[in-house]
Regions:
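Aromatic- and Gly/Pro-enriched helix-to-coil junctions and flexible linker segments
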Residues: 9-259, 312, 332-502, 506-546
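Short, charged low-complexity linear segments at domain edges
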Residues: 9-15, 270-296, 300
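Bacterial N-terminal signal peptides
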Residues: 1-10
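Cys/His/Pro-rich metal-binding microdomains
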Residues: 31, 307, 326
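Short metal-coordination and nucleic-acid-contact micro-motifs, chiefly zinc-binding Cys/His arrays
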Residues: 26, 299-305
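Short, hydrophobic/aromatic alpha-helical segments in well-folded domains
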Residues: 190, 237-238, 291-295, 305, ...
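Extracellular glycan-recognition modules
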Residues: 250, 264-265
Length: 546
């Protein structure tokens, strides 16, 4: 009789131990590979029934249970789970005790839900709108129906003045004046006026900039470590887009692909500041990790970054999905482009993304370790599999010349010539001033003369380079040795002239850099003398990491 009375208690205790001690461990360490999303080796462990069906436990005898043998194994190829640390002795003992007690399960145990069945991954369908008295707006009707079902009585409508105050604060972030509180125009007219206000874009841009992680650049001194210089251009684009009532979908496309969708429209290319903001100086993988993480969070509401080292614990995102997503961004880089009216990129410039290396290859990093790429398999760019049915086919596009060679634009060439001309004028003025000083300032005159010579050499180099570029861009694949050789020689002369100036300075780092530049220029000159004609196209942009 005592045994009979004790038996149900033991069964209940064993089932309770499973719920409290065993199932949480299985969920944390095993479901990712043996749950609803994936069943490696045909094993699923999210219910006791599935575990027993796979014959990996021998009820009452843990020593003969394959499950126990695998979690206790010292062989890395055999031990489960394969990632992370082994189960603790306490966790292993709890599993063995549970098996010894008969591997009992709680009554009515249900398997975990398939993440793909979650409403967030279902096709969007327009719901039926319930008919509710005195309510015309669909959202209000849906809310009212739910409130009625749950016995919730909504608060009464507020008076007009309070409603106007709330409207102002919501749409433009500013309180109304006393006169505006007395506005008797139709409600819709007030709403339209506030939506047309420039403050509307400024007020709501603040929230979107938080979601999209707007941040000005920062680093050490002049060194750029995070974000990009002049990123305020992206900020302005956000404000302007909201004020122009741009659709959310069009804004997302512009932020992710504005350089390809609008290659000859700098106003729209500003949107790619979203990607440029993720720049990180010290590690390319960290840079791309940030891009993947915050693109997923901002536009999908998903933590794709959790699948870098292993399949996602609870969302239908595999580790391969993570690297397919990375492959989309693998070729991209960031650069500063010149803007009309200012050739000095330190003062102004357009931070933007561009495809720098279309041949860049993506590999899976084993367990997320960038030092262990699996080079057996090349990963192609693609969205996560659960989105593949919606994905557009990848197509090659042809960009206009100024998009990939900004130096080919006439206004850019003119701006570079004007900047070089002003440097000559400034150096000339300094030389004239030095020549009128006393003999004690002879060293200053020597330096002023070198600066003047360097400015003139740089001006000639810009002129020759533009001439060579104009032929090169107008005649793809053809060569003009005279133009190319002149451009190359003037470039070398400009470097040598500038290195003389820097070597006379007091900055040790600049002097060292000048000596190295001089050495390279002389080597290049020697190559020219041997008949090897190569010149550098006009450099008007500044690429990240340069």
């Amino acid at each position: 009789l005592l045994v009979a009375l004790a038996l149900p208690i033991s069964v209940e205790a064993a089932a309770s131990a499973y719920e409290k001690e065993i199932k949480p461990v299985l969920k944390e360490r095993c479901y990712a590979c043996h749950g609803a999303l994936k069943q490696k080796a045909g094993l699923r462990v999210d219910t006791v029934a599935f575990i027993k069906e796979a014959s990996v436990i021998a009820s009452g005898d843990p020593e003969k249970s394959e499950l126990v043998q695998r979690i206790r194994s010292n062989d890395e190829e055999e031990r489960m789970p394969p990632e992370g640390h082994a189960l603790t002795q306490v966790e292993v003992k709890a599993i063995m005790d549970w098996i010894t007690a008969g591997a009992l399960a709680p009554e009515g145990e249900r398997p975990e839900d398939d993440p793909l069945e979650h409403w967030a991954f279902q096709k969007i369908e327009r719901p039926d709108i319930p008919k509710v008295d005195d309510i015309s707006h669909p959202v209000d009707a849906l809310l009212a129906a739910k409130q009625k079902d749950r016995g919730i009585i909504p608060v009464a409508a507020v008076d007009r003045k309070l409603a106007i105050r709330r409207l102002y604060l919501d749409l433009i972030g500013l309180p109304p004046t006393r006169g505006q509180l007395e506005d008797n125009r139709p409600w819709e007219a007030i709403v339209d006026e506030l939506l047309a206000s420039p403050q509307h874009g400024e007020r709501w841009a603040r929230h979107w900039m938080d979601v999209w992680r707007y941040s000005d650049w920062y680093g050490l001194g002049a060194q750029l470590r995070y974000s990009q210089r002049h990123l305020w251009h992206w900020r302005d684009w956000i404000v302007e887009s909201l004020n122009e009532n741009a659709g959310y979908d069009s804004m997302v496309r512009a932020m992710l692909a504005g350089d390809e969708l609008f290659p000859d429209n700098p106003d729209q290319v500003r949107a790619t500041g979203f990607l440029a903001r993720n720049y990180f100086l010290f590690n390319r993988t960290t840079w791309l990790d940030n891009t993947i993480e915050h693109t997923g969070k901002a536009f999908l509401g998903l933590t794709i970054n959790c699948a870098k080292c292993h399949d996602h614990k609870y969302d239908p995102i595999s580790a391969v999905d993570y690297y397919r997503f990375r492959a989309i961004f693998e070729p991209h880089q960031v650069r500063l482009d010149p803007l009309p009216g200012d050739a000095d990129l330190d003062k102004n410039g357009l931070p933007r993304v561009f495809d720098d290396n279309l041949e860049a290859v993506t590999y899976v990093h084993q367990r997320g370790d960038e030092k262990k790429p699996d080079k057996e398999t090349k990963i192609d760019p693609q969205v996560p599999e659960f989105l593949s049915a919606f994905a557009s086919p990848i197509k090659k596009i042809k960009l206009p010349l100024p998009a990939y060679a900004p130096g080919s634009s006439k206004w850019v060439q003119e701006a570079q010539l004007e900047a070089a001309k002003k440097r000559v004028e400034k150096a000339t003025a300094e030389l004239v001033k030095a020549e009128t000083t006393t003999e004690e300032a002879a060293s200053q005159m020597d330096l002023a003369k070198l600066k003047w010579e360097a400015a003139r050499a740089e001006h000639k180099s810009v002129e020759a380079t533009i001439a060579a570029d104009q032929f090169r861009f107008a005649n793809p694949g053809k060569s003009n040795e005279d133009l190319f050789r002149t451009a190359a020689k003037t470039q070398v002369a400009a470097v040598l002239a500038r290195s003389k100036v820097e070597r006379l300075g007091t900055d040790a780092k600049k002097k060292k850099a000048a000596r190295e530049a001089k050495k390279k220029a002389e080597e290049r000159l020697a190559q020219l003398d041997k008949g090897k004609v190569e010149y550098d196209s006009l450099r008007v942009t500044r690429k990240a990491l340069e």
